[in-house]
Amino acid sequence: MVKYEDFLAGKQHIPPSCGFEVDKPAMNIHMFEWQKDITRWALRKGRAALFEECGNGKTIQQLEFADQVAKREGRPVLIVAPLTVGAQTLREAQKFGYSAAICRTQADVTPGINITNYEMLQHFDGRSFAGVVLDESSILKNYTGKMRNQIIEMFKDTPYRLSCTATPSPNDYMELGNQVEFLGIMSRTEMLATYFIHDGSDTSKWRLKGHAEDRFWEWVSTWAVVLTCPGDLGYPNDGYILPPLNMTEHIVEVESGDKYSLFGGEIAKTLTERRDARRASLRERCEQAAEIIAQNPDEQWVCWCDLNAESELLTECIPNSEEVRGSDKPEAKEDALIRFANGYLSVLVTKPSIAGFGMNWQQCHNMIFVGLSDSYEQMYQAIRRCYRFGQKRPVNVHIVTSAAEGDVKANVERKEQQAAEMKQNMVQYTKEILRKDIRGQERIVIPYDPQIAMIVPDWVISE
């Protein structure tokens, strides 16, 4: 009979190391020293995550990772990016001297670096790639979604994997679980069972076990680098000091007799009620946004909205504005976003779900949120399109809401504080990562060491 200890030992799985060393002189000359160190660490690991504040140069790091893997293995590497970001990644590749191509199907794949978007993944064979890079990988946060399952299954045998995104959402441990499962380090279920306690019946309510918090963040630091600025790793912060962020809330009143109006006096509580309140104040909010922009008509503005009706009315109210909708053809979206990035479009009206991830708009320093969803991450990402390293001017963020929506600004600031605390915890342990020489990645399985002998009932013992 197999001993129980041997049985448990047999359940442990340590995948083979797939990382390799790269000398700094062999890396792209346009990279900063700290970018080289992080990328070398990721290549040694083979499978890693880069959670970096916007503007730290994740693009050149992921391009270097992909290029080094492709050269070493002699096989193509795939970079997967949001629909509106792929063309920008290609331009960055060309600027830094990488050979890369945009691909829509497997037939388009060329040796070296290939770039596609998440919507095209079903047209590719994951087994043909030596490595995969997920850009803006927070798309995995939809942990019950088809996309998450497709990505994890498609690349489960891919030797080299890199996940790149901004720092995770506040207390969104499910997102970390998805990241670690994509990397093949530990399943999300194992992570939750090891480090977390489930609160109540809501499947999303997980909290860290008190005694496991330090161990959890130490474990995260074995596969993820978390960076708010180069100074987190002891490098100079020259050029990486952000200008002021000015956030102003504008509260409009609705005098329509609606239950969410000035005379109705109710505060929306549920998601449905908040959406109803936004519809009730639609015209007032859009007109307020137009008035704000009219005060500085010669500067560029981004108008973020949540509803199609908001997008349509904003375009009507604001001169020289252009709307980018989800139903637009990919080429039309790309054209409008590039024109805005190059300064040829004065006012862009769109949703965070369309253009809130990955775009670099440091040339613009004014934005308005005319409609907000309940996603903190979407707002965080949308603000970071302009408020990122490389921005030279103070960034002005205007939030236009109705009185029925409550104190939106205070809620945003509360979540921002939560995010800052989470980043600080992760950075605290990540600081030492680059001083270690760790190769590959081990699948973490916590050994079970029973202190009390198991009593087996007589009726389950075979004669």
Which residue stretches match the model-derived regions?
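Conserved Walker A/P-loop ATP-binding site and its immediately adjacent core
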Residues: 59-64, 73-95, 170-175, 307-308
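A conserved SF2-helicase RecA2
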Residues: 374-462
